[in-house]
């Protein structure tokens, strides 16, 4: 897909003016900015960015033990399944004894989102979130949940998504030397008063 406008105006310089290549389902490493020409190849591109730079360990988890270099690598690929809480910032204050709406987004590399689970107790228990409309396999999928803090104090909120292929975000991030494809479950801490 070629993008030349955004929000009804020419694409801004920082976003790739005059034209940007958009590759749904793939990481931004493939979203070429300031596109001037297109060359169609029948083999993998052998330039620096494919052969040396944007590479991950060539195994099922795209990970290695911390500090260990991978034996073999491959180019970065499709998005991993990922989700975020977008309605509350880390450190937010919420009212004790009142329902707190929690919203966010989930997405992946094109399989589509099957389920989102929400935890208000640092991952000890998980509850199904309500999924918003499915706008297509490459779209963000909104989700909604709610929790009522029953006592004053700190709460660790977590969210994790599962896609239609059965892939679920890992509770702990997987490590690789470049930090690519990070999709561990994030935590948003809130205080109830």
Question: Model regions: which residues?
Answer:
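Extended, aromatic/histidine-rich regions of cofactor-dependent oxidoreductases associated
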Residues: 1-193
């Amino acid at each position: 897909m070629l993008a030349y406008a955004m929000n009804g105006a020419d694409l801004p310089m920082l976003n790739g003016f005059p034209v940007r290549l958009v590759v749904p389902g793939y990481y931004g490493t493939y979203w070429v900015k300031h596109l001037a020409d297109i060359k169609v190849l029948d083999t993998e591109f052998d330039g620096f960015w494919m052969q040396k730079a944007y590479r991950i360990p060539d195994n099922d988890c795209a990970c290695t033990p911390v500090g260990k270099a991978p034996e073999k690598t491959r180019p970065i690929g499709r998005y991993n399944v990922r989700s975020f809480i977008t309605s509350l910032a880390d450190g937010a204050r919420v009212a004790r004894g009142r329902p707190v709406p929690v919203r966010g987004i989930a997405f992946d590399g094109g399989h589509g989102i099957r389920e989102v689970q929400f935890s208000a107790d640092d991952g000890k228990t998980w509850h199904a979130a309500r999924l918003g409309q499915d706008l297509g396999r490459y779209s963000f999928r909104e989700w909604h949940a709610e929790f009522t803090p029953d006592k004053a104090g700190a709460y660790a909120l977590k969210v994790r998504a599962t896609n239609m292929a059965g892939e679920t975000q890992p509770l702990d991030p997987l490590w690789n030397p470049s930090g690519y494809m990070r999709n561990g479950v994030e935590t948003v801490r809130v205080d109830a008063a």
